[in-house]
Amino acid sequence: MGEHQNVKLNRTVKAAVLTVSDTRDFVTDKGGQCVRQLLQADDVEVSDAHYTIVKDEKVAITTQVKKWLEEDIDVIITTGGTGIAQRDVTIEAVKPLLTKEIEGFGELFRYLSYVEDVGTRALLSRAVAGTVNNKLIFSIPGSTGAVKLALEKLIKPELNHLIHELTK
């Protein structure tokens, strides 16, 4: 698989960032802002229209994700709502939409979180990734540490390859 890591796409990758939180707004949303900055640093387009915040409510999350699935977007990244608290419903909203789950993402994310970031608290994460038709969805925790780990170690290194595989 190593030969696929440097896949170049002949177009700009387009992403959407959805922060799920009952308390964050556009000023205090460090996780969503971090996702956006890390993607844009790699020339991934995240327009203002494709960055928003919704409450920890299953219908709100599902509605926004479904809306973006109908648009010209390659990848949707949700932050927040992936834990085990009663209000954490991102996974329940996103997982039923997936055509295929990318199990390795959640497994590797939890492993790296354990080793490099939060230790045994990694078991609380229910981070998930998958595909819906020819689009990718990643649901990750909202902390900036988790965002950086997911984006820098897993998502960004494989993003072009994943999109290439989905669209060939």
UniProtKB/Swiss-Prot annotation:
GO biological process, one term: Mo-molybdopterin cofactor biosynthetic process
UniProt keyword annotation of Cell membrane present: no
InterPro entries: MoaB, MoaB/Mog-like_dom_sf, MoaB/Mog_dom, MoCF_biosynth_CS
Keywords: Molybdenum cofactor biosynthesis
Source organism superkingdom: Bacteria
CDD domains registered for this protein in UniProt: MogA_MoaB
Cross-referenced Pfam families: MoCF_biosynth
Pathway(s) it belongs to: Cofactor biosynthesis; molybdopterin biosynthesis
Record-linked PROSITE patterns: MOCF_BIOSYNTHESIS_1 (PS01078)
GO cellular component labels: cytosol
SUPFAM superfamilies, per database record: Molybdenum cofactor biosynthesis proteins
Family listed: Belongs to the MoaB/Mog family.
PANTHER family assigned: MOLYBDENUM COFACTOR BIOSYNTHESIS PROTEIN B (PTHR43232:SF2)
Job description of the protein: May be involved in the biosynthesis of molybdopterin.
Protein name: Molybdenum cofactor biosynthesis protein B
Organism: Staphylococcus aureus (strain Mu50 / ATCC 700699)
